[in-house]
């Protein structure tokens, strides 16, 4: 559990006592402070090796019971997830805004699942492998950079308004399956 309370964390090295298995899971819960920017609720780099699944929960420190990271600048922020090729799955859930980047080191990432997010998620992946992305019910953005190929798939999570549709950004060399009835804005 990471309770930022208006403090940016530089590097955070995590691991398991025994990560020798083939189905190791690391759970990270983020609790940002309401009224603070992503930089203030941020982690520059989460570093780990030999873990196949990373589960991230994005929430807010609750004092009054009604806080939420809702403004444009508010967010739980992970600037980089530095994993090795063992990482194949990242699951993101929670009810408060999150911005995260999975670094290119996670070359075998195959699933980036934010379907458990009920608020906005801004996700970036640089994985060269085929990635299946599932977005949540918020106003989500997925960035592939230059790694989007015909083998990647994106499923929208139900945010289907004309002005706040889920967004995909990439330098497109190929676009494969996009499912759902929402709008897909490509820029």
At which residue positions do the language-model features occur?
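Solvent-exposed, low-complexity segments and loops of surface/extracellular structural proteins
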Residues: 1-187
